[in-house]
């Protein structure tokens, strides 16, 4: 029967970790349920190591983003997407896929478009990681059987979309720490600063300058762990040493999950995955969204409205402004504990299982 193990489920995802992490989580859940998974991705992600997709058939498709590009680059991007769609259609027809699950971004466009044109059309499910529906998903929603959302109240939904809030699947290392008890700081204050896949350059100057403005007694209590671009580590270390801040700096931490669970307060960007991880573990946060990304502002507001986070806009956040917020929070452990509880209230349990259920339900609808 179509939809059983011989008919694979195609995962269409690529680009950044924000798209790949939920794709991996759901693929892992579906494989544990006996489903065969095929990955369709882009050249950027083709070489990335993934324990989940290591044994899966994978296909690298042509494609390119269109937003913010010149007319010439857009025309070239359209041509690449068309080429990727033709290739995806041939592959999907040969596979007789039961479903295509897209995770946003341009790598999802060719497989979903191709699926929509097949005579034996597979089920199409789209997942969006942000509180604002992304451009690719807005375009593809007209072809989807179901649209899976990470947040209640997601902005930009098409009127006829069959939308279900599943939550944003997070990494297994985060899931096992769900609802870890929060212990307010007594003496040492553990501050964790995350800036995306390779650190945010602005944090490397903003955070040390803000910490230097705190009262000396508070500075002496802080143990800072900060993700920092390699070329900025020297200057950041010098500023932190001068301020008397205990610190650990690196471009990347492989063990972010336990560091997040141990933190008393986070300062971070507010990509969909980061916000989902903060809610899953339940930790207070100061979010400074990427200045050009309205999605991140809306994501941050999901926790800020509940009292679990502060949102500070990058354009108006000076060292003095950040120092003021840090001091008000770090001097008030009961407030931090209340924020942790509020952040955890936004957690959506078993997001990967919920999305897997939706995919299998969409397949069942197609074979009826």
From Swiss-Prot:
Swiss-Prot/TrEMBL keywords: Cell cycle, Cell division, Cell inner membrane, Cell membrane, Cell shape, Cell wall biogenesis/degradation, Glycosyltransferase, Membrane, Peptidoglycan synthesis, Transferase
E.C. numbers: 2.4.1.227
SUPFAM superfamilies (alphabetical): UDP-Glycosyltransferase/glycogen phosphorylase (SSF53756)
Enzyme class: transferase
GO-annotated molecular function: UDP-N-acetyl-D-glucosamine:N-acetylmuramoyl-L-alanyl-D-glutamyl-meso-2,6-diaminopimelyl-D-alanyl-D-alanine-diphosphoundecaprenol 4-beta-N-acetylglucosaminlytransferase activity; undecaprenyldiphospho-muramoylpentapeptide beta-N-acetylglucosaminyltransferase activity
This protein's pathway: Cell wall biogenesis; peptidoglycan biosynthesis
Compartments, record wording: Cell inner membrane
A Pfam family: Glyco_transf_28
Stretches assigned to coiled coil: none
Record flagged with keyword Amino-acid biosynthesis: no
Signal peptide residue numbers: none
The keyword Transcription appears for this protein: no
Membrane topology, from the record: Peripheral membrane protein
GO annotation (BP), single: cell division
Binding site for UDP-N-acetyl-alpha-D-glucosamine: 16-18, 130, 171, 197, 296
Superkingdom of this protein's organism: Bacteria
GO cellular component: plasma membrane
TM annotation in the entry: none
InterPro entries, per database record: GlcNAc_MurG (IPR006009), Glyco_trans_28_C (IPR007235), GlycoTrans_28_N (IPR004276)
Alphabetical list of NCBIfam families matching this protein: murG
Protein family: Belongs to the glycosyltransferase 28 family. MurG subfamily.
Function: Cell wall formation. Catalyzes the transfer of a GlcNAc subunit on undecaprenyl-pyrophosphoryl-MurNAc-pentapeptide (lipid intermediate I) to form undecaprenyl-pyrophosphoryl-MurNAc-(pentapeptide)GlcNAc (lipid intermediate II).
HAMAP family: MurG
Name of protein: UDP-N-acetylglucosamine--N-acetylmuramyl-(pentapeptide) pyrophosphoryl-undecaprenol N-acetylglucosamine transferase
Organism (species): Acidiphilium cryptum (strain JF-5)
């Amino acid at each position: 029967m179509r939809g059983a193990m011989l008919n694979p489920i195609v995962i269409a995802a690529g680009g950044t970790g924000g798209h790949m992490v939920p794709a991996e989580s759901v693929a892992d859940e579906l494989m544990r349920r006996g489903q065969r998974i095929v990955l369709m991705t882009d050249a950027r992600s083709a070489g990335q190591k993934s324990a989940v997709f290591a044994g899966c058939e994978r296909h690298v498709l042509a494609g390119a983003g269109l937003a913010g590009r010149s007319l010439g680059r857009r025309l070239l991007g359209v041509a690449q997407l068309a080429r990727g769609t033709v290739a995806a259609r041939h592959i999907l027809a040969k596979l007789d896929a039961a479903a295509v699950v897209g995770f946003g971004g341009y790598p999802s466009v060719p497989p979903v478009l191709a699926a929509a044109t097949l005579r034996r059309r597979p089920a199409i499910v789209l997942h969006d990681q942000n509180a604002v529906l992304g451009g690719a998903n807005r375009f593809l929603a007209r072809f989807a059987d179901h649209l899976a959302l990470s947040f209640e109240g997601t902005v930009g939904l098409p009127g006829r979309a069959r939308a279900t809030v599943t939550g944003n699947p997070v990494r297994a290392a985060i899931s096992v720490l769900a609802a870890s008890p929060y212990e307010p700081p007594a003496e040492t204050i553990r501050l964790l600063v995350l800036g995306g896949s390779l650190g945010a350059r602005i944090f490397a100057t903003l955070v040390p300058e803000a910490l230097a403005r705190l009262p000396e007694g508070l500075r002496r209590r802080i143990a800072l762990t900060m993700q920092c671009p390699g070329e900025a580590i020297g200057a950041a270390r010098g500023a932190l040493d001068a301020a008397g801040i205990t610190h650990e700096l690196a471009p990347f931490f492989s063990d972010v999950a336990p560091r997040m669970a141990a933190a008393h307060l986070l300062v971070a960007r507010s990509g969909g995955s980061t916000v989902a991880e903060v809610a899953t573990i339940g930790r207070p946060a100061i979010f400074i969204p990427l200045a050009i990304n309205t999605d991140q502002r809306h994501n941050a507001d999901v926790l800020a409205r509940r009292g679990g986070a502060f949102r500070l806009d990058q354009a108006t956040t000076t060292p003095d402004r950040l120092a003021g917020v840090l001091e008000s929070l770090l001097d008030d452990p009961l407030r931090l504990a209340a924020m942790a509880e509020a952040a955890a209230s936004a957690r959506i349990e078993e997001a990967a299982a919920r999305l897997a259920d939706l995919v299998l339900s969409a397949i069942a609808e197609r074979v009826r």
